[in-house]
Structures are given as structure tokens and as C-alpha cells.
């Protein structure tokens, strides 16, 4: 049976006793966000709103975005990516499970040197697709033209942030390309593989990662 959102004890600063609150509310307080579903308007508004709020609340401390998503809507993914580049805090992107399609684009959008893939994560990139391929011919042609512009823009971002030539990324995006964490690092999609670096930084810099993750 579904158990709903787990609750955990959390003591609000100034209170003597802890209260039981939703897990995700605690994570948000620790500046930790989750993208664990298909990318649609609702989750996009949720994540971008939290990023903006956390940036206003504290423009210095890092934000951590965990990703386990099969991808989703093109424009929604671009909205998250653009918000990540706009807010003042650095954003760690951490892939666990899978980051496919637009989710890999969001993973790529993390602060350079702060993009992480867990050892058994899978990353997939491919070209954007249209949802209107059954439209009438004039509408379809307009959609294809717009899709071509968006594809070129996304390809340029991949090329810029991975250091790969534009033509290499363009050819790779012609098909579904699945990568292991090590392959994604070699490609330039992520900077760190595994949790060894997390453990290292947690031991030496208590501020580097949220307190709750030190015992992982």
C-alpha cells in the first residue's frame, strides 16, 4: 500500500522539541532538491520556484539537485537549465539512477566541477523530438523549423559545456546514446564519478555537503 510522503523528526531553530514534518520539506531546508520524475510543467515550476526562493534566502550557499529522471518536455527542461544559470548560488547536479534526454541537459547545467554521477548511474542524450508530428502539413513545417532552431541551440550548449566539437555532439545526438558514469565523465557531461569525493569533502569541509548526508 502507498505510505505517502515519509515524515522525519526536525527541530526548527529556536524550538526545544522536534516535530514530524514531510521528508522533502526537511530536504528543502537543507537546500537539497529532487528531480525524480518526468519533466513536466508542474515539477518545473516547483523546482524553479524553490531555486529562486533559496537564492533570495541565501545567495552564497550551494544548492544540491539530485536527478533520477527519464527526461520530458523540452521547454520545461530548458526553463530549469536557465534558472540554474541565473540564480547566484552554485548548483551541484547529482545523477543517481538515470538522467536521460532533457534530464541529461539539466545534469550538464550544474556548476563546472560540481556535476556528479553515482557509479551505477546511466546518462542518455539524443536529439529533441516534436510532439506535433501528426499536425497538418503547414503546421508541421513550422514546427520542424522551430525544432531545428532549438536542436542547434541545445547542441551548442552541449558542445560548449563538454568541450566537444559541435559536429561531434550533433552526430551523437542523431541516436540515443547511453553512457555509464565513467563514459559521461570522459565525454564531459559530469566532473566526478562516485561518492568518494563527497566523503572526502564531508570529512574536510563540513559546509560542502548537507549535514544529513555525512553518514551515508
From Swiss-Prot:
Cleaves peptides in various proteins in a process that requires ATP hydrolysis. Has a chymotrypsin-like activity. Plays a major role in the degradation of misfolded proteins. It is found in: Plastid, Chloroplast stroma. The gene is clpP. It catalyses: Hydrolysis of proteins to small peptides in the presence of ATP and magnesium. alpha-casein is the usual test substrate. In the absence of ATP, only oligopeptides shorter than five residues are hydrolyzed (such as succinyl-Leu-Tyr-|-NHMec, and Leu-Tyr-Leu-|-Tyr-Trp, in which cleavage of the -Tyr-|-Leu- and -Tyr-|-Trp bonds also occurs). This is ATP-dependent Clp protease proteolytic subunit. GO terms for molecular function: ATP-dependent peptidase activity; serine-type endopeptidase activity. Belongs to the peptidase S14 family. Component of the chloroplastic Clp protease core complex. InterPro entries: ClpP, ClpP/crotonase-like_dom_sf, ClpP/TepA, ClpP_His_AS, ClpP_Ser_AS. GO terms for biological process: proteolysis. GO terms for cellular component: chloroplast stroma. Keywords: Chloroplast, Hydrolase, Plastid, Protease, Serine protease. PROSITE patterns: CLP_PROTEASE_HIS, CLP_PROTEASE_SER. Its EC number is 3.4.21.92. Coiled coil: none annotated. It holds the Pfam family CLP_protease. It comes from the Eukaryota. The active site is at residues 101, 126.
Amino acid at each position: 500500500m502507498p505510505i505517502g510522503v515519509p515524515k522525519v523528526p526536525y527541530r526548527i531553530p529556536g524550538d526545544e522539541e522536534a516535530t514530524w514534518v514531510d521528508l522533502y520539506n526537511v530536504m528543502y531546508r537543507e537546500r537539497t532538491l529532487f528531480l525524480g520524475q518526468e519533466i513536466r510543467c508542474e515539477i518545473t515550476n516547483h523546482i524553479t520556484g524553490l531555486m529562486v526562493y533559496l537564492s533570495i534566502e541565501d545567495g552564497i550557499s550551494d544548492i544540491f539537485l539530485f536527478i533520477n529522471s527519464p527526461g520530458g518536455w523540452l521547454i520545461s527542461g530548458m526553463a530549469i537549465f536557465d534558472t540554474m544559470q541565473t540564480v547566484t548560488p552554485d548548483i551541484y547536479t547529482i545523477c543517481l539512477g538515470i538522467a536521460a534526454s532533457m534530464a541529461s541537459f539539466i545534469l550538464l547545467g550544474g556548476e563546472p566541477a560540481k556535476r556528479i554521477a553515482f557509479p551505477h548511474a546511466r546518462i542518455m542524450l539524443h536529439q529533441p523530438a516534436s510532439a506535433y508530428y501528426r499536425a497538418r502539413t503547414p503546421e508541421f513545417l513550422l514546427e520542424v523549423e522551430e525544432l531545428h532552431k532549438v536542436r542547434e541551440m541545445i547542441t551548442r550548449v552541449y558542445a560548449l559545456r563538454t568541450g566537444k566539437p559541435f559536429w561531434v555532439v550533433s552526430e551523437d545526438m542523431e541516436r540515443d546514446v547511453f553512457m555509464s558514469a565513467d563514459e559521461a565523465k570522459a565525454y564531459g557531461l559530469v566532473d566526478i564519478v562516485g561518492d568518494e569525493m563527497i566523503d572526502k569533502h564531508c570529512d574536510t569541509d563540513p559546509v560542502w555537503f548537507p549535514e544529513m548526508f555525512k553518514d551515508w
